[in-house]
UniProtKB/Swiss-Prot annotation:
Lineage: Viruses, Riboviria, Orthornavirae, Kitrinoviricota, Alsuviricetes
Transmembrane segments: 4-26
Name of the protein this chain belongs to: Movement protein TGBp3
InterPro entries the record matches: TGBp3
Role noted for this protein: Plays a role in viral cell-to-cell propagation, by facilitating genome transport to neighboring plant cells through plasmosdesmata. May induce the formation of granular vesicles derived from the Endoplasmic reticulum, which align on actin filaments.
Main localization of the protein described in the UniProt heading: host cell
Annotated family: Belongs to the Tymovirales TGBp3 protein family.
Keywords tagged on the record: Host endoplasmic reticulum, Host membrane, Membrane, Transmembrane, Transmembrane helix, Transport, Viral movement protein
Protein's GO biological process: transport of virus in host, cell to cell
Domain of life: Viruses
Pfam family, any one: TGBp3
Length: 71
């Protein structure tokens, strides 16, 4: 095999690797996280449609006074 063929093979492998890395990076997404604390409600990386927005609007921060403990 001559030097030009080796160079072409190396370039092909590099381009294929770059394409694979980019495509994997584009398909990975963060999970939807809704964190409710005593002070706030935080929504991170979630797809928000109108139904989800309405549901989130009714949430309130966690409060011990509103919790009931049944014996």
């Amino acid at each position: 095999m001559e030097a030009g063929a080796y160079l072409n093979a190396i370039i092909f492998v590099l381009v294929a690797t770059i394409i694979a890395v980019i495509s994997v990076g584009l398909t990975q997404t963060e999970p939807c996280t809704i964190r409710i604390t005593g002070e706030s409600i935080t929504v991170h990386a979630c797809h928000l449609d109108s139904e989800t927005i309405k549901a989130l609007a009714t949430l309130k921060p966690l409060s011990l006074e509103r919790l009931s403990f049944h014996q």
